[in-house]
């Protein structure tokens, strides 16, 4: 996968990167509630399932912002030209999950075809990583459809330079005539600030509002 190198000598976040990578090693998690009322209406018109559609929308938003596509490669900070989703699928019979990956395509129908092909091939494979090694240029998506939450955090230890974002969805919430989806966004502070997380969330909300436009 192609990528762009970041020149740390001229990068406007070089001080922030050094601080949160070397001195105050930290990430942060931000949980919000997306209004998916319009999106659920669109689902009825398209015939698509909710989970893969959200995987598509999150991947689409990620691929608009370099902050969510960063990694260390050969000890250099880079951002991928494109990031592809790694998503979890649940196995009821074993009460375990697998992590699968499919390629991101800007075209929704093309993405859905790829997603459906991957899930059909591995739907009965209960290994954690049925496809083997995950792509380097990945983002992480999972869902907890059994429970709603107002906050969610993963405590990642032992890999201070893991910059791929983690997105976790929860059970819908009904508030009046609106349907809300709790979504947690977890990032490494070395490459992403609150501003970037907020911009991502606002972009994702616009995509949910205008999926058919």
UniProtKB/Swiss-Prot annotation:
Transmembrane domains' residue ranges: none
A GO MF term: chloramphenicol O-acetyltransferase activity
What residues make up the catalytic site?
189 (proton acceptor)
Please provide the record's keywords in A-Z order: Acyltransferase, Antibiotic resistance, Plasmid, Transferase
* Annotated Gene3D superfamilies: Chloramphenicol acetyltransferase-like domain
- Catalytic activity entry: chloramphenicol + acetyl-CoA = chloramphenicol 3-acetate + CoA
Q: What is its EC number?
A: 2.3.1.28
> What biological process terms from GO does the record include?
response to antibiotic
Pfam families in alphabetical order: CAT
- NCBIfam families referenced in this protein's UniProt entry, alphabetically: chloram_CatA (NF000491)
Function of the protein: This enzyme is an effector of chloramphenicol resistance in bacteria.
Oligomeric state and partners? Homotrimer.
- Miscellaneous information on this protein: Type II chloramphenicol acetyltransferases are sensitive to inhibition by thiol-reactive reagents. The inactivation occurs as a result of chemical modification of Cys-26.
Q: Which PANTHER family does this UniProt record tie to the protein?
A: CHLORAMPHENICOL ACETYLTRANSFERASE (PTHR38474:SF2), SLR0299 PROTEIN (PTHR38474)
* UniProt family annotation: Belongs to the chloramphenicol acetyltransferase family.
This protein is called Chloramphenicol acetyltransferase 2
Q: From which organism does this entry originate? A: Escherichia coli
